């Protein structure tokens, strides 16, 4: 919903109009103050008269502009927060600047100009309009932006001394690097079964993420804390963390239920807790998955699940999806995908699959190559399968070194 009172107040400040000047002949000064402070039971006709005098606009146009411009503004904010190029969006925003001043995103033009060339790693010592910064600081909550992130940016931009800016950003960047290293360490502890240690380490990592306003790291830590809480049979604690995920989800643009079901399901599947994995993963079946890498990770878990459950029709459907996806990739990725689908097919069809030489070779190949092509997490998913293969092959020494290196 458009915040009319805030819109009127900001425009009045920008146009340097007094309350008495703006409300003359329309309403009393106290009524205008109530409008600006969003008091209820104000006649919409009075609000429209104020808007028309202020900006030659009415409520309907204000709402229409808000809805029309929202996707562009959100995309700019996303790129800014990921430190990506925004020049093409800035050009569109410049074209629309008149309309930005007539929408819920009245401040957006100022934000984009202030941060149009802002680079976290190359900070220019340029003069910033203090009045603009004050205005943004006062009403940053007006837009659908991440307040904590912009609060930190504004705080550092205010520094007159460039060295201070660089020092603080280097501190944040170093903190981010340290934070991510600790996060991955805690994630490994979790998958190795050291749940208490993973939980305590992730809590410290989360505190660092909050200090540095690293939204992505905050998100990962909260999810891991929720998983740890479930493993520790603390359901109340896990609910608290998943509720925090909901608070971050709108910015991250993730479907929170999808994220939770996928991560819990994949974790249970990796731990070979098949019934719990099914409880979470089967909720993802209703989605349609296009042939993309992000879809592959979900389809792979579903295919793996139904292979374990020996549900042939569903397992074959997802195995065929992987084969079709593989045909669209370059040889390096395609080869790995083919090994994955072949291993699932053998596991599905042969009761004594562990003794199948091709299955053994495929699993070893997947484990050895999946980290460089996909991720460390994907490699870890296949550790239990590799362990089964090495045990049946009596390759105890190699298995020992894998655990030692981890």
Predicted feature residues:
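Short alpha-helical DNA-recognition segment
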Residues: 15-34
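TPR-adjacent "capping" and linker segments in tetratricopeptide-repeat scaffold/adaptor proteins
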Residues: 58-71, 173, 371-374
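Extended amphipathic alpha-helical coiled-coil/heptad-repeat regions
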Residues: 112-398
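Alpha-helical residues within helix-turn-helix
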Residues: 10, 20-21, 45, 49
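Residue-level detection of the helix-turn-helix DNA-binding "recognition helix"
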Residues: 13, 27, 37-38, 52
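Helix-turn-helix/homeodomain-like alpha-helical modules used for DNA recognition
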Residues: 69-120, 294-298
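DNA major-groove recognition helix of helix-turn-helix/homeodomain DNA-binding modules
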Residues: 43-61
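A short, Lys/Arg-rich alpha-helix, primarily the initiator
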Residues: 1-14
């Amino acid at each position: 919903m458009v915040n009319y009172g805030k819109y009127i107040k900001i425009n009045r400040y920008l146009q340097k109009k007094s309350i008495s000047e703006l409300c003359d002949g329309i309403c009393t000064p106290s009524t205008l103050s109530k409008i600006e402070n969003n008091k209820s039971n104000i006649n919409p006709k009075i609000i429209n008269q104020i808007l028309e005098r202020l900006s030659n606009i009415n409520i309907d146009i204000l709402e229409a502009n808000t809805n029309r411009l929202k996707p562009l503004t959100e995309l700019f904010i996303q790129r800014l927060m990921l430190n990506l190029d925004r020049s093409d969006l800035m050009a569109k925003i410049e074209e629309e600047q008149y309309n930005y001043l007539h929408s819920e995103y009245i401040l957006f033009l100022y934000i984009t100009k202030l941060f149009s060339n802002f680079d976290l790693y190359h900070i220019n010592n340029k003069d910033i309009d203090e009045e603009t910064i004050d205005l943004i600081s006062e009403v940053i909550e007006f837009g659908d932006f991440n307040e904590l992130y912009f609060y930190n940016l504004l705080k550092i931009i205010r520094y007159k001394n460039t060295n201070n800016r660089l020092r603080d950003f280097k501190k944040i960047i170093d903190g981010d690097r340290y934070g991510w290293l600790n996060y991955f360490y805690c994630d490994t502890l979790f998958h190795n079964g050291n749940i208490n240690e993973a939980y305590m380490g992730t809590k410290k990592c989360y505190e660092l993420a909050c200090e540095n306003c690293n939204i992505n790291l905050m998100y990962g830590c909260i999810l891991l804390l929720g998983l740890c809480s479930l493993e520790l049979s603390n359901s109340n604690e896990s609910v608290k963390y998943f509720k925090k995920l909901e608070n971050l989800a709108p910015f991250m643009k993730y479907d929170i239920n999808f994220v939770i079901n996928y991560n819990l399901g994949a974790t249970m599947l990796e731990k070979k807790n098949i019934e719990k994995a099914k409880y979470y993963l089967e909720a993802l079946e209703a989605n349609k998955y296009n042939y993309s890498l992000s879809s592959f990770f979900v389809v792979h878990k579903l295919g793996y699940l139904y292979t374990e459950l020996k549900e042939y029709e569903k397992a074959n459907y997802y195995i065929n999806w992987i084969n079709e996806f593989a045909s669209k990739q370059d040889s390096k990725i395609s080869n790995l995908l083919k090994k994955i689908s072949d291993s699932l097919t053998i596991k599905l069809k042969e009761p004594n699959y562990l003794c199948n030489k091709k299955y053994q070779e495929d699993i070893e190949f997947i484990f050895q190559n999946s980290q460089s092509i996909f991720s460390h997490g994907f490699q870890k998913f296949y550790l239990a399968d590799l362990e089964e293969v090495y045990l049946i092959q009596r390759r105890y020494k190699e298995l020992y070194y894998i655990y030692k290196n981890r």
